[in-house]
């Protein structure tokens, strides 16, 4: 049994990869699923569609790999984080659509928590800013709006979970209601110092403890799949939120190492070791992973709109036919000619945390063309990352020596060069871009003893290309100053 199955449940698609012990992909499958926007600021997924696409991908990947489920050493799961589900324990049926991490419907509830003076208490316990991004206020909203939900929750009839919990519940035939420490740390309900659910915060939001999953290590066997799902009972031995899994897959095992994932959003995580670093610059202190009871912490900066900006150029503006076309279009001009795009379509994440910022486009002239807007879009992705690195540096977690990158948009050579230029440090792209799924596989493999430890895993990591900064310092500083001026104008655009 030398194969691993990685289930990668993302924001826009479900993926599954079968990997061998060398981290080589033997079979893969991917399916997209529908995004639902029932009201402005709302983003939902169909929980049943999440399951259907993920499990179908798992079976297809095994078939393409020519690997029977009985030959799997373990299953690892990685998932879109913070997305919130509520279901019946008796049937496993979801009571409402999944509220996606991008959803802003609880922004006003977060305002009330801040106005009541709870922000410092929440930050001290969870390491998080009070924001609609996280699960806590989403869950409270479901309990308030699904008829009878709070009473049923108190009676122990309902279960809450992020996507990992939802998948494990159904993989195990309802036998397991668990989440890993990293996913738990994204709920705004988990004390990251004591590594347990915070009773004070549960009481504050009137969330019955009976709803909550058991918190387990990110690496280690927590149970098995039921044979009906995959065709055999397979140990479930790895669970990690997508960004934690990507950090693990990038072998960022030493304090000070960092990776940025360019997906729907962009997520920069820096390993801070066995001790949490409290940010004074509105970054998130989070749990990277927990193995054998030992916790590794990280600083995180979350960008809400990353690759989604390229999708908007394609679907919203019609400037490109395919997402890959943005590189050639942006490369057709030497710079953006002063055009600045602030992609605050759903507000701004770290380090601003402004739910009322909105997307803005500055510096347009009669000479502005599609190529300038495309280039400004790539620059916006890179400049948001610059803001995060600067905040980490101020928090004492830097200076950054190099940035490891992954995610779909990391394949864009122009974006990676722009990123290196604006950061002023090398950007390193690995040979294996599927680092999120790889991280899930690594966590699972470690959990069943496939590797001796993280040192052996680190030796597997290989760079594909290194992008060195070539931009002059004065041009870099001018671009960053122009960007920050634009961000200030975009902030607070809509009324609270």
Curated annotation (Swiss-Prot):
It is an enzyme of class 2 (transferase). Sn-glycerol 3-phosphate binds at residues 11, 81-82, 133, 242. It catalyses: glycerol + ATP = sn-glycerol 3-phosphate + ADP + H(+). Glycerol binds at residues 81-82, 133, 242-243. Keywords: ATP-binding, Glycerol metabolism, Kinase, Nucleotide-binding, Transferase. Pfam families: FGGY_C, FGGY_N. One of its GO terms (molecular function) is glycerol kinase activity. The keyword Thylakoid does not apply. Transmembrane segments: none annotated. GO terms for biological process: glycerol catabolic process; glycerol metabolic process; glycerol-3-phosphate metabolic process. Its EC number is 2.7.1.30. Inhibited by fructose 1,6-bisphosphate (FBP). Pathway: Polyol metabolism; glycerol degradation via glycerol kinase pathway; sn-glycerol 3-phosphate from glycerol: step 1/1. PANTHER family: GLYCEROL KINASE, SUGAR KINASE. Key enzyme in the regulation of glycerol uptake and metabolism. Catalyzes the phosphorylation of glycerol to yield sn-glycerol 3-phosphate. NCBIfam families: glycerol_kin, PRK00047.1. Belongs to the FGGY kinase family. This is Glycerol kinase. It comes from Aromatoleum aromaticum (strain DSM 19018 / LMG 30748 / EbN1). The lineage of its organism: Bacteria, Pseudomonadati, Pseudomonadota, Betaproteobacteria, Rhodocyclales.
């Amino acid at each position: 049994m030398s194969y691993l199955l990685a289930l990668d449940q993302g924001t826009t698609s479900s993926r599954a990869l079968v990997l061998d012990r060398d981290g080589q992909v033997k079979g893969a499958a991917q399916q997209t699923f529908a995004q639902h926007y029932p009201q402005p600021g709302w983003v939902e997924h169909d929980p049943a569609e999440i399951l259907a696409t993920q499990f179908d991908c798992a079976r297809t990947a095994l078939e393409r790999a020519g690997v029977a489920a009985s030959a799997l050493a373990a299953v690892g799961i990685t998932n879109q984080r913070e997305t919130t589900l509520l279901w019946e324990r008796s049937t496993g049926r979801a009571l409402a659509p999944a509220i996606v991490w991008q959803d802003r419907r609880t922004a006003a509830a977060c305002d009330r928590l801040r106005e009541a003076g709870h922000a410092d208490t929440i930050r001290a316990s969870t390491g998080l800013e009070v924001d609609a991004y996280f699960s806590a206020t989403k869950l409270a909203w479901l309990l308030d709006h699904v008829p009878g939900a709070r009473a049923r929750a108190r009676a122990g009839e309902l279960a809450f979970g992020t996507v990992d919990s939802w998948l494990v519940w159904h993989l195990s035939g309802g036998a397991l209601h668990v989440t890993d420490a990293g996913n738990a740390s994204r709920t705004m309900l988990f004390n990251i110092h004591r590594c347990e659910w915070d009773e004070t915060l549960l009481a504050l939001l009137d969330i019955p403890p009976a709803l909550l999953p058991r918190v387990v290590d990110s690496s280690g066997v927590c149970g098995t799949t039921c044979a009906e799902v995959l065709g055999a009972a397979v140990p479930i031995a790895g669970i990690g939120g997508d960004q934690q899994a990507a950090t693990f897959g990038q072998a960022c095992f030493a304090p000070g190492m960092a990776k940025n994932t360019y997906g729907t959003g962009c997520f920069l995580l820096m390993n801070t070791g066995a001790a949490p670093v409290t940010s004074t610059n509105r970054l998130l202190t989070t749990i990277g992973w927990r193995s054998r009871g030992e916790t590794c912490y990280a600083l995180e900066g979350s960008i809400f709109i990353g690759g989604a900006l390229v999708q908007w150029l394609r679907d919203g503006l019609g400037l490109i036919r395919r997402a890959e076309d943005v590189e050639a279009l942006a490369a057709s001009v030497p710079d953006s000619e002063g055009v600045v795009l602030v992609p605050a379509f759903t507000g701004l994440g770290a380090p601003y945390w402004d739910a009322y910022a909105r997307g803005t486009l500055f510096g347009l002239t009669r000479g502005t063309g599609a190529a300038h807007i495309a280039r400004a879009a790539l620059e916006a992705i890179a400049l948001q990352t610059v803001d995060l690195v600067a905040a980490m540096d101020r928090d004492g977690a830097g200076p950054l020596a190099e940035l490891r990158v992954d995610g779909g948009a990391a394949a864009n050579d122009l974006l990676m060069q722009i990123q290196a230029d604006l950061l002023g440090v090398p950007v390193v792209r690995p040979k294996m871009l599927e680092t999120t799924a790889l991280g899930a596989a690594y966590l699972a493999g470690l959990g069943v003893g496939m590797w001796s430890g993280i040192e052996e895993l680190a030796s597997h990591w290989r760079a594909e290309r290194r992008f060195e900064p070539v931009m002059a310092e004065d041009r870099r500083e001018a671009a960053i100053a122009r960007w920050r001026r634009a961000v200030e104008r975009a902030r607070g655009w809509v009324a609270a």
